[in-house]
Amino acid sequence: PVDYLKDVADAMMSCEFGVIYFGLGLTQSLGRFRNIEVAIALARDLNRKTKFIISPLRGHFNVTGANVVFAWQTGYPYAVDFSQGYPQFNPGENTATDLLRRGDNDATLIISSDPGAHFPASAIRNMMKHPLITINPDMNAISRLGDVVFPTPRCGIEYAGTAYRMDSVPITLKKVVEAPPGILTDEEILTRILAEVRAIKVKRGEPVGQTEVQPPAQKESVKESKPCKT
């Protein structure tokens, strides 16, 4: 109703500091990232009257950390496609859900996540048609479906690292107890996988790309810490 919308607008304009949190209801419904553009425009207009910010409402540990690392390495926070040899950003086309629902994958690597409990059934069915590798600290739904399963210790408990708060502030996490013998961190596992991939490409005479990606200069608190993989 129009009267209700007027009440909402009055409440937003009369507050001293407002926050618009958005989630999958905007990003995965009709319109996709265009919905976010409208929400950003709303926040911009509200700042003419009062103080307003907009932020995604993330639901799992260190999701912001993954977005921050993607952003400083590629310039884009997520939905990054490297198939052309350089990063391309196309939300609504290149997100994991979109790729899996279309069946574009021929293998899937899951790192510290559980799409088996959250992704649409059509995406999971297409994922299961091809090799599935999981790197997870928990035996969750997707780990039980994996063809290859790598257990890992928990960041902030069994090894030190950095996690990012929902407002992108880095928090240093300390090691509390020793990890079980022989259990590698996700960083160590990925480093070994990358080394094997590059060795195979060298044997085939294929270019191996950059040996190391250097992020741009960050604040000292960020540069001194390693983000936990998510």
Model-derived segments and spans:
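Non-catalytic alpha/beta scaffold blocks inside enzyme catalytic domains
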Residues: 1-51, 75-77, 81-230
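Short connector loops at secondary-structure junctions
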Residues: 51-77
